[in-house]
Amino acid sequence: MNSRILSLAAAALSLAASTVQADEWSANFAASNNYIWRGLTQSINESAISGGIDFASDSGFYAGTWASNVSYAADDVYSYEHDLYAGFAGEASGISYDLGYLYYNYDAEAEFDFGELYGSIGIGPFTFGLNVLANTEADEGPGQDFGFGEATYFYTDYSTTIGNGVDLGFHIGHHKGDFSEAFNGVPGDYTDYNVSIGKDGFSFMITSTNLDDAGPDALDNDDIKFVVGYSLDIEL
């Protein structure tokens, strides 16, 4: 989901820098053979279809909604993820910034909705970001703490164009806190990393984590995963 927000923040920043001031509505659609979130499958390593609608203002403000199918086991209560987000993106002294709030909504039976505050800065081809748990409806287990700031995700991205419109990206992120263990069945502290290439909406990513035999076997979150996808953005 973070990649969707980064794209929207970039659009808001582009509008703010444009000499032609105009608000912008857009829609997006994507399909892939796996839904990966912070190195972990959200679709039991099966295909996912997603889409959303976004608004970006020339003031730097943006907001949007996004949804995808999800599953964590063959018989679990999760079937969809529906996100709502809003933020503000801008640039100062050649450094871009993005601040916002993201709410993750799941099936009512799951009772695991949660929200995060996020922020990032961009310096040249690098982006440094931090997501912080803000609130959740999930119940804490013994010894767990789901309070504000008790789960964090820090990441660094590097992106560049290598010619002929081919985009190359590298990512590394680190999660810390009890919430990931409760939600995804993996240890609270872990690192994920990936490398990706993309062109004209098509993308290919190799991703993995430093986990070792963690979580349900069906999720294989300690294995290297190959993700192929296609995305389409439409101006409304």
Residue ranges with predicted function:
Residues 2-8, 13-236:
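Outer-membrane beta-barrel proteins
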